[in-house]
Amino acid sequence: MAGPGSPRRASRGASALLAAALLYAALGDVVRSEQQIPLSVVKLWASAFGGEIKSIAAKYSGSQLLQKKYKEYEKDVAIEEIDGLQLVKKLAKNMEEMFHKKSEAVRRLVEAAEEAHLKHEFDADLQYEYFNAVLINERDKDGNFLELGKEFILAPNDHFNNLPVNISLSDVQVPTNMYNKDPAIVNGVYWSESLNKVFVDNFDRDPSLIWQYFGSAKGFFRQYPGIKWEPDENGVIAFDCRNRKWYIQAATSPKDVVILVDVSGSMKGLRLTIAKQTVSSILDTLGDDDFFNIIAYNEELHYVEPCLNGTLVQADRTNKEHFREHLDKLFAKGIGMLDIALNEAFNILSDFNHTGQGSICSQAIMLITDGAVDTYDTIFAKYNWPDRKVRIFTYLIGREAAFADNLKWMACANKGFFTQISTLADVQENVMEYLHVLSRPKVIDQEHDVVWTEAYIDSTLPQAQKLTDDQGPVLMTTVAMPVFSKQNETRSKGILLGVVGTDVPVKELLKTIPKYKLGIHGYAFAITNNGYILTHPELRLLYEEGKKRRKPNYSSVDLSEVEWEDRDDVLRNAMVNRKTGKFSMEVKKTVDKGKRVLVMTNDYYYTDIKGTPFSLGVALSRGHGKYFFRGNVTIEEGLHDLEHPDVSLADEWSYCNTDLHPEHRHLSQLEAIKLYLKGKEPLLQCDKELIQEVLFDAVVSAPIEAYWTSLALNKSENSDKGVEVAFLGTRTGLSRINLFVGAEQLTNQDFLKAGDKENIFNADHFPLWYRRAAEQIPGSFVYSIPFSTGPVNKSNVVTASTSIQLLDERKSPVVAAVGIQMKLEFFQRKFWTASRQCASLDGKCSISCDDETVNCYLIDNNGFILVSEDYTQTGDFFGEIEGAVMNKLLTMGSFKRITLYDYQAMCRANKESSDGAHGLLDPYNAFLSAVKWIMTELVLFLVEFNLCSWWHSDMTAKAQKLKQTLEPCDTEYPAFVSERTIKETTGNIACEDCSKSFVIQQIPSSNLFMVVVDSSCLCESVAPITMAPIEIRYNESLKCERLKAQKIRRRPESCHGFHPEENARECGGAPSLQAQTVLLLLPLLLMLFSR
């Protein structure tokens, strides 16, 4: 398809082939001489097009008017250089106060819970009708409320994304595998009812709070505000608060763990499957402050990951998943030599502790086996007695109890716990027992450590799946504290009652950051004590495969993976170590879906956020990004110009805090400012400095509205409706928009709308057109076409923007950017018209873009095509179309290649999978398998016929097959940037049988280049240059080094691994299958057989 305005006929291809054949025959083996493309003609075309398109852009954007208006105020403004160190300290202080408010709310819940429990006396016969979150408002067939399902008033609340909630009461969720009326549950629910008034009081004190909750050690979960819980698509609510990170982190101290798995011959079949699931469940309970290794043993030791022989590794998600994959490779044979395994485990813990790299706190050995023939007291005497600093937790797999006594003795003699796991359904409940044992020293110390989790998306809560913003699921951190029994008679037992917590959306942090003080490219970011990102504009949580999905390792992205130019981790390590200081480096920031790169120098300022494990950093780009100016106008002037209908403000910026009072939550930021300035809402808290600058920008930019309106009303202007939108944005987040066509006629309906995150002011960055314009020479326009997210670029518009500077010098801040969006067809027609001009008096041009022998292109400073005779090439990278020419431009220095790295990429990988074995590691499949196993046992008991092997075979005997999945990976890819100093150049490329000539000429006052290429020489021997990312593959030895490598981290400040007064007599016993459990499972059995 020919581009708009290109007159080339469809028969050209055939004619060209015939001419080429005749020419080749005439020349034989003689290399053809290249066609000479006159530079002067191309220069004329470029000048004509540049003048025309700049005239249009300047006229319709009003750039000259706006520049003039700011110049008029030049003497009335004060320019300041931003003090980055003072700025980051102030921001850290603001965040510290915000975090402190959240932790104080949690502390009040702790005090109330402990007081209520102290006053309560356990009553095994207690009958209490509580609000069960699953059953509330449910009726039977006669219309009566179900038991525990009383009427519970719910109303949509805008603070909770309009979810129906009850802000007067909490309700209670009980795990599916637990009995709703178990005496322990009923008693716990009864005394914890007193938390309701504290929940409400906390919300009154701090209306920005969202979910508050108490997770009981008995398993129930009390949540405020109360909400109805709905089962997932499988009819199950798998949530158990005790295996959530906030619960585990608050309940226990950091730990070093060695997991020993018996793989002797007696562990074959279902026992090994249960053992693997037990290991997987233990891994689920380990967090970023823990360290672990897994050793399988029979007559020999088999490290699950041989590379990590004799050491421990951090329990981050990546490492845990790596070990899970290796679990599938375990198989049972031989005899079990537990003494060898225990010796190895003790030695590893001792050696690793001496390196100073681990948790330097709790230590434990987890033993998973179907029996032990000895108590191995000589080993314990050698390594662990009398202090018993290493706890032994033993898990007996299977129904036989012949060797239970030895395993129980080992656990009890080493301050551990013994459990028996007979079925897959038993795994999770039994694994979690060890957490409450590890919590004992903390409880005895009565140390209510405040813990903050890493950033995460909690999608297990039904309401959390709906609590999303425009960008997808809400990223949050949780502040939590443990709740202890204060009854004197149980003090030495160290009884943990549970954990209280509240969620803090990360966007709450961003509200404390004055984006206008950070400059166009500036940003704030925060990391945890492990160096993982809490918030950073480059953190990408989701990937797209059919629909948007969470990346598996999104919560453990290290700062060094986004600020990758800091190869020595200088910035990262200083922040992890809670230093205050400054660091500078050249950075390569990608924009526009990673296809373009801006090279700049950033100054980083950092400090710690006291009372939390977090550190805060601020990045300011050198040059205009380091300067700020203050203008001054009267409130009356500013208010008048804010009333104009074309004015809007950045909704994600905090001009006024509308969260403090419920009556303000419905206000937009612009509405809040107007009420504040008019004195109608004295309770509104606003940023006076920012609002003063908003008023200044509103006054200075106000005349442009009338200017745009006059253009729109002039019928002789823009008659072909080529220019559709004019827009401006200022450093304060103020925007103005004018449509030159009806809204329904806009080619790009999404432009500047809330969903168009790249092109509007948001919490992370200025609009793309603003950022790119700021890097252009003042007075010039930057032109671009938006990239489609799909495989084919469907853009039909061109965006042009330019920056407005206050002063004609380098330190001048960029105060605003203005631009237009026009139809691509209109833009391309202007190009083709300009390319027909020539200086010849007789009107006969020596060369034309209409000629068969040349191809004409218009490309931007990153090498992307805006105009080509083949319309389908629009938006493509020039190197993919003209590889030989792009290669020559790189060699000549007209363009330079910049290598970029993506450490958050997702790559396709072929994995060998067995639906059965791997599926068992999924909780739901595991549960279904458990139900099948229990049913088998019942059948065994009733008919004494072994159906187990038959029933279980469908879960294990499925053939291995290759499955293609997307997995986290590292990639390398190029970006290209033009050299500004080179305005024009010509070149010749020696190909196999011809010489290819070309001319490249910069379009004046723009980021564009006209490229005219000799098309008679195809030069197919030179491969196209692509921008496709290449996966960085690591060989086995490098993979091993990366596994072993441990970046600098800071351990949590508190540790409660041991207490001499601990009463370790409660150390477990063999559970029995209760009738009530069978009754609970019957509905699930029916569901299973109906599938």
Curated annotation (Swiss-Prot):
One Gene Ontology term, aspect cellular component: presynaptic active zone membrane
Transmembrane spans: 1069-1089
Boundaries of every VWFA domain copy: 256-438
CDD domains: PDC2_MCP_like (cd12912), vWA_VGCC_like (cd01463)
Motif (MIDAS-like motif): 262-266
One Pfam family it belongs to: VGCC_alpha2
Signal peptide limits: 1-28
Glycosites: 166, 309, 553, 632, 793
Main location (coarse class): membrane
Binding site for a divalent metal cation: 262, 264, 266
Keywords for this protein: Calcium, Calcium channel, Calcium transport, Disulfide bond, Glycoprotein, Ion channel, Ion transport, Membrane, Metal-binding, Phosphoprotein, Signal, Transmembrane, Transmembrane helix, Transport, Voltage-gated channel
Phosphotyrosine: residues bearing it: 924
InterPro entries reported in the protein's UniProt record: Ca_channel_alpha-2/delta (IPR051173), VDCC_a2/dsu (IPR013680), VWA_N (IPR013608), VWF_A (IPR002035), vWFA_dom_sf (IPR036465)
Post-translational modification: N-glycosylated. May be proteolytically processed into subunits alpha-2-3 and delta-3 that are disulfide-linked. It is however unclear whether such cleavage really takes place in vivo and has a functional role.
GO MF, one annotated term: voltage-gated calcium channel activity
Ranges where the Cache domain occurs: 452-549
Location(s), subcellular: Membrane
Extracellular side: 29-1068
One annotated GO biological process: cellular response to insulin-like growth factor stimulus
Cytoplasmic side of membrane: 1090-1091
Tissue expression as described in the entry: Only detected in brain. Not present in lung, testis, aorta, spleen, jejunum, ventricular muscle and kidney (at protein level). According to PubMed:11687876, it is brain-specific, while according to PubMed:11245980, it is widely expressed.
Role this protein plays: The alpha-2/delta subunit of voltage-dependent calcium channels regulates calcium current density and activation/inactivation kinetics of the calcium channel. Acts as a regulatory subunit for P/Q-type calcium channel (CACNA1A), N-type (CACNA1B), L-type (CACNA1C OR CACNA1D) but not T-type (CACNA1G).
Subunit and interaction comment: Dimer formed of alpha-2-2 and delta-2 chains; disulfide-linked. Voltage-dependent calcium channels are multisubunit complexes, consisting of alpha-1 (CACNA1), alpha-2 (CACNA2D), beta (CACNB) and delta (CACNA2D) subunits in a 1:1:1:1 ratio.
Domain commentary: The MIDAS-like motif in the VWFA domain binds divalent metal cations and is required to promote trafficking of the alpha-1 (CACNA1) subunit to the plasma membrane by an integrin-like switch.
Note in the entry: In contrast to CACNA2D1 and CACNA2D2, it does not bind gabapentin, an antiepileptic drug.
Name of the protein in its database record: Voltage-dependent calcium channel subunit alpha-2/delta-3
Organism: Homo sapiens (Human)
